[in-house]
Amino acid sequence: MSARNILVINCGSSSIKFALVNEAQEQFPLSGLAERLGSPEAILHWQQGDERDSLVIAGADHRLALSHLLPIVQRVAAGELHGIGHRVVHGGEYFSGASRLDAVSLQAIRQVAPLAPLHNPANLLGIEAAMKLFPTLTQVAVFDTAFHQSLPEHAYRYAVPEALYREHGVRRYGFHGTSHRYVSQKAAQMAGLPADASSWLVAHLGNGCSTCAVENGHSRDTSMGLTPLEGLVMGTRSGDVDPNLHSHLARTLGWSLEQIDSMLNKDSGLLGLSGLSNDMRSLEQAREQGHAGATLAIEVFCYRLAKSLAAMSCALRRLDGLIFTGGIGENSALIRSKTLEHLGLLGFALDPAANARCVRGVGGPIQAAHGPLVLVVPTNEERQIALDTLALLD
């Protein structure tokens, strides 16, 4: 049987990220982005090998954008497209793994949409459009939350009245599960350990950030909670704050819940601390030039990250190593170094030369000779979604 092709789709409210994944090839035969959907500036960008191209699709919605994408995908796949994998942010307690898309699974995704109002409705737009355009293809949903359904109850429950959990699903769900699962499996391979008999601390650091404790291939705790706002300092998200901050701002400043939610999700984190940018690359450059806000943002980011990793270690009975992944985790030697400075009590130490080498897609071990294993592992959520989709084709 020839190698199979899976189209992976990740839909936002006005965008579609996509990748054509061939199970026998490391590089994607095709990848790209449709952005500014629903506006006169809507455009489709794609890359095939070293070639890049664009197509103006003014006013296109998700379905029309996918209809423009279809012939490009079929040409690159030589007419051999075997399935479509959709990233879905929230699966609630319904999904502990990937699921074929049908009327039942679609209804479940709709039911948990209030838990991810910024994400699930957009994911559904792409799913519904793709199912109309590709009615004969198997389509699969892969959930950010599914990997964390293995959390024990003492890790996922909030200390709030029981009825809020039983009747309204108020609990910790966690996110970035596809990435945490992929890199922990890769780390086990790199270390020569079985994935189902190894334990890892994982730091997924991008514009969104989370940590995870992975034991024997299962998530045991993670820093994000009911929503992706809980936990670490992120690009524009505050992470953990005093839960009374909402009522304090409402009483003292007269802010509405919508204003407070917007501030915590869009104006906080690295951007709020620095007053400059949510981009770690810009902040590192500004820090070099003496910018006080950028310096503070980096210090807070690294301290809070180290604190979270130390807390995650409580969920493990042994520790085989620490993994850095995501755009920041894979590319910022400074963030890795400053974070591990706070974790000396756990024995972590870096080899500066190895740490400096692991950027721009280069992974590998970066620990000092005497310290516990520390790995930079480039994530590949698209490939993991494709693998999960292929598993449901068999």
UniProtKB/Swiss-Prot annotation:
GO MF annotation: an example: ATP binding
Chief subcellular location: cytoplasm
Gene3D superfamilies hit by this protein: 3.30.420.40
GO cellular-component term (any): cytosol
Positions annotated to bind ATP: 17, 204-208, 279-281, 327-331
Essential cofactor(s): Mg(2+); Mn(2+)
Presence of the UniProt keyword Nucleotide-binding in the record: yes
Chain sites annotated for binding Mg(2+): 10, 381
A Pfam entry, by short name: Acetate_kinase
Cofactor note: Mg(2+). Can also accept Mn(2+).
GO BP field: acetate metabolic process; acetyl-CoA biosynthetic process
Annotated site location: Transition state stabilizer: 176, 237
Keyword Nucleus annotated: no
Enzyme class of the recorded protein, top EC level: transferase
Pathways per UniProt: Metabolic intermediate biosynthesis; acetyl-CoA biosynthesis; acetyl-CoA from acetate: step 1/2
Signal peptide: none
Superkingdom of origin: Bacteria
EC code: 2.7.2.1
Quaternary structure (record): Homodimer.
Family from the record: Belongs to the acetokinase family.
Protein name as catalogued: Acetate kinase
Source species of the chain: Ectopseudomonas mendocina (strain ymp) (Pseudomonas mendocina)
Protein encoded by which gene: ackA
